[in-house]
Design a protein with these regions (language model features):
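FAD-binding core/adjacent interface of flavoenzyme oxidoreductases
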Residues: 2-3, 71-154, 234
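Beta1-alpha1 glycine-rich phosphate/pyrophosphate-binding loop at the start
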Residues: 2-75, 154-155, 160-196
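Short glycine-rich anion-binding loops that position phosphate/pyrophosphate groups of nucleotides
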Residues: 15, 109-112, 239-241, 337
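Short glycine-enriched, charge-decorated loop/helix-capping segments at active-site entrances
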Residues: 48-56, 119-124, 201, 250-251, ...
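A Rossmann-like FAD-binding core segment of flavoenzymes
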Residues: 76-83, 171-266
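FAD-site-proximal beta/loop scaffold in flavoenzymes
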Residues: 120-147, 227-301
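A conserved FAD-binding loop/helix module that cradles the flavin
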Residues: 264, 282-334
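C-terminal auxiliary extensions adjacent to catalytic cores
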Residues: 336-392
Length: 392
């Protein structure tokens, strides 16, 4: 009888959610599936701006990974990856326990390292799981502070996250305390707002920011002086790799590019260790000269290919190739019941775009809620409880 294989998924990312969804429908016999993450309720990135603006409750935008694991027959381990030994095929967890694997998939997202800003609260847009408590403190301070002293908000980052977070937070604060003025400034070291989007979408974003009372400072680097004059700094600069990815001693020989992102081939597989897969923000897709955008839509589209290739690897079959879209639809919420649509040279705005975005996002998140509610799609033999440190 063949030995049980262990597939370990580290991270509660969008791609891993799809692996679990597929596993629930069609589990692989003879495989123990383990999911490791300190985040049980993982926010769907596409709905975060709407949640910031108050359009959604927090429970409406999260994927419940422990319940999804239960439905897929997977073991859930509430821990964080501390280090990796790719040669010995073992991950070391924040609990101090080692966890061996036959196959490993990393979908751990990215992070940000905001600088200290004297006199200002700093709200970092990554990692998403840390946003709810931090944002709750911001809203509490805004609503409970006596008087009507104006607040000055500074957004750092001229990409989609920077634009959406600024518009969303401004709208939320004004709705909560219409008696208090709030002023915004968006700072970006890029000479252009939303580089990569269509000219029409960039113009629409500029109009939305102006209508919200947000001034633009393009081609300007962040400085501590800016933070000193702000009540709140929204930090939405480019994604950064986690500390363990940037530390040679902790990544255990796994090949990374200069920024620490895991180098993967067209099959979403590590270029240095074929038994390791990576997807989403934590990965650098080698076939593209500059990699792929750090955007949720990329991880979502990698999900089905990742699920297929993990199954192929288990069976010893050749992997499939991931083919990124040359152009993909971007829908940016503007916090006022409207949105901006951009794809290639196309760009438009309106309430219809928000309704479109809302339908897409709710349909996406509903799939995981339904799967978690219904439980396993097929009957399966009961599994024994996992003890970290067990041999695979």
């Amino acid at each position: 009888m063949a030995a049980m294989k262990r597939l370990v998924l580290v991270g509660a990312g969008h791609a891993h959610a799809q692996v679990l969804l597929e596993w629930r429908r069609r589990p692989a016999p003879g495989v123990e599936l383990v999911v490791v993450s300190p985040v049980g309720l993982a926010p769907y990135s596409g709905m975060v701006p709407g949640w910031l603006a108050g359009a959604y409750r927090h429970d409406e935008i999260v994927i419940d990974f422990p319940r999804l694991c239960a439905a897929a027959g997977a073991h859930w381990v509430d821990a964080e990856l501390d280090s990796l030994d790719a040669q010995r095929q073992c991950v070391h967890l924040s609990t101090g326990a080692p966890l061996e694997y036959d196959l490993l998939s990393l979908n751990v997202g990215s992070t940000l390292r905001p600088p200290p800003a004297a006199g200002a609260r700093v709200l970092a847009m990554r990692p998403l799981a840390l946003l709810p408590p931090a944002y709750g403190e911001v809203l509490s301070a805004w609503t409970s502070e006596p008087g009507a002293r104006p607040w000055r908000l500074t957004g750092v980052g001229g990409g989609p996250a920077g634009v959406e977070s600024m518009l969303a937070v401004m709208a939320r604060l004004r709705r909560l305390r219409p008696d208090r003025p709030v002023h915004g400034t968006l700072v970006s070291d890029s000479a252009q707002l939303l580089p990569g989007l269509s000219p029409a979408a960039r113009r629409a974003a500029s109009r939305a920011l102006a209508a919200a009372g947000v001034s633009l400072r393009l081609g300007s680097a962040w400085s501590a002086q800016v933070g000193e004059h702000s009540d709140l700094v929204l930090w939405a600069t480019g994604a950064q790799a986690h500390d363990w990815q940037r530390d040679p001693a902790r990544r255990g020989g796994l090949a990374v590019q200069a920024g620490g992102f895991i180098r993967i081939d067209e099959h979403l597989r590590s270029v240095s260790h074929p038994q390791v897969f990576a997807s989403g923000d934590c990965a650098h897709w080698e076939p593209a000269a500059g990699g792929l955008p750090k955007a949720g839509v990329v991880a979502v589209r990698m999900g089905p290919v990742l699920a297929d290739n993990l199954r192929r690897a288990i069976a010893g079959r050749a992997p499939a190739s991931y083919r990124p879209q040359p152009r993909f639809l971007v829908l940016l919420a503007t916090g006022d019941g409207r949105a901006i649509a951009s794809r290639g040279a196309f760009g438009a705005e309106g309430a219809w775009a928000w309704r479109w975005k809302n339908r897409i996002d709710r349909r996406f998140i509903r799939r995981y809620a339904v799967a978690a509610e219904r439980g396993p799609a097929v009957s399966r033999a009961p599994t024994t409880s996992l003890h970290e440190g067990d041999s695979a």
